[in-house]
């Protein structure tokens, strides 16, 4: 086992952007007391996305019931109950930001009977009521594999249904101890087979996986009906989180992109700063994916 990845390379140095769009996005989110995965998960693309007037809305609060070792979101066994005004607040924020394509995600809420699925449905419907014509990408949790909860959300027919497997199966115990690799694949498969949705998933690299394992997981995703994939570098949020095993080079990310395309994915984003909702509008299907 090596002692670590060493000094962060130049290609991982973040260029901070600001300006009027950044300030107005931050002001809008603060005014409505809205959470974003950009801020809660310490995303490296926050400045870029907010400067372009985009954000990924985080539903069900900013406290998760799980403790994945890669994630910066806070954890508790019993977070506060969901804000009943959150769906309407997000709908108004989408309208104010003039978004054509809105991205929603949420924390895991294993403390709620339906995992928060009803709140998801209320948010989707509120957005569509106020913003006719907007397309939605829903980056959902696994709802503990509860098919009724999954179906509640999938029946709303979001334009893109996203669920991240995050890493290869050999790293699940260390990275996602409260999740199951096969369960996450089953979420993707259900969205495709039962509801014919455009499907998407994401993985992080630099967490101890091998290239062979990554390629095998990409084929697993395709075999379960996944259309689109993102691959990005894992960056340790704090000293208490899982250490980075290595920094993947831009050339390797390009090779991963080619591997994914060869596996049959319709859209692929692969790069050091790529995250599941990064440039999500580029994944918006212009034709029905099946």
Swiss-Prot record:
Cofactor requirement: [4Fe-4S] cluster
Main location, first listed in the record: cytoplasm
Pathway of action: Protein modification; protein lipoylation via endogenous pathway; protein N(6)-(lipoyl)lysine from octanoyl-[acyl-carrier-protein]: step 2/2
The keyword Thylakoid is annotated on this UniProt entry: no
Residue ranges of every copy of the Radical SAM core domain listed in the record: 50-266
Catalytic activity line of the entry: [[Fe-S] cluster scaffold protein carrying a second [4Fe-4S](2+) cluster] + N(6)-octanoyl-L-lysyl-[protein] + 2 oxidized [2Fe-2S]-[ferredoxin] + 2 S-adenosyl-L-methionine + 4 H(+) = [[Fe-S] cluster scaffold protein] + N(6)-[(R)-dihydrolipoyl]-L-lysyl-[protein] + 4 Fe(3+) + 2 hydrogen sulfide + 2 5'-deoxyadenosine + 2 L-methionine + 2 reduced [2Fe-2S]-[ferredoxin]
MF terms in GO: 4 iron, 4 sulfur cluster binding; lipoate synthase activity; metal ion binding
EC number(s) given by UniProt: 2.8.1.8
SUPFAM superfamilies listed in its UniProt record: Radical SAM enzymes (SSF102114)
InterPro entries: Aldolase_TIM (IPR013785), Elp3/MiaA/NifB-like_rSAM (IPR006638), Lipoyl_synth (IPR003698), rSAM (IPR007197)
Binding site for [4Fe-4S] cluster 2: 64, 68, 71
Positions annotated to bind [4Fe-4S] cluster 1: 38, 43, 49, 277
Cofactor: binding comment: Binds 2 [4Fe-4S] clusters per subunit. One cluster is coordinated with 3 cysteines and an exchangeable S-adenosyl-L-methionine.
GO cellular component, one term: cytoplasm
Protein keywords: 4Fe-4S, Cytoplasm, Iron, Iron-sulfur, Metal-binding, S-adenosyl-L-methionine, Transferase
EC main group: transferase
Subcellular location: Cytoplasm
HAMAP family found in the cross-reference section: Lipoyl_synth
Family label: Belongs to the radical SAM superfamily. Lipoyl synthase family.
UniProt protein name: Lipoyl synthase
């Amino acid at each position: 086992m090596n002692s670590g990845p060493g000094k962060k390379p130049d290609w991982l140095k973040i260029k901070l952007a600001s300006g009027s769009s950044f300030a107005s996005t931050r002001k809008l989110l603060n005014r409505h007391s809205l959470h974003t995965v950009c801020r809660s998960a310490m995303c490296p693309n926050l400045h870029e996305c907010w400067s372009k007037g985009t954000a990924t809305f985080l539903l069900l609060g900013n406290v998760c019931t799980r403790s994945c070792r890669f994630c910066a979101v806070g954890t508790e066994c019993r977070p506060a109950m969901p804000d009943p005004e959150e769906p309407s607040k997000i709908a108004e924020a989408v309208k104010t930001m003039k978004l054509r394509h809105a991205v929603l995600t949420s924390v895991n809420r294993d403390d709620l009977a339906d995992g928060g699925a009803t709140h998801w449905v209320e948010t989707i419907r509120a957005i569509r009521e106020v913003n006719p014509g907007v397309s939605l990408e829903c980056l959902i949790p696994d709802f503990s594999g509860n098919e009724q909860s999954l179906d509640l959300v999938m029946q709303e027919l979001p334009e893109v249904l996203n669920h991240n497997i995050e890493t290869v199966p050999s790293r699940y115990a260390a990275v996602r101890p409260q999740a199951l690799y096969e369960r996450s694949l089953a979420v993707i498969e259900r969205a495709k087979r039962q509801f014919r949705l455009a499907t998407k998933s994401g993985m992080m690299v630099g967490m101890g996986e091998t290239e062979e394992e990554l390629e095998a997981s990409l084929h697993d995703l395709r075999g379960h009906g996944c259309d689109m994939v993102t691959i990005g570098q894992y960056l340790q949020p704090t000293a208490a989180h899982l250490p980075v095993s290595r920094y993947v080079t831009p050339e390797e990310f390009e090779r991963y992109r080619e591997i994914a395309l060869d596996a049959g994915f319709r859209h692929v984003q692969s790069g050091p700063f790529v995250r599941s909702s990064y440039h999500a509008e580029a994944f918006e299907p212009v034709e029905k994916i099946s």
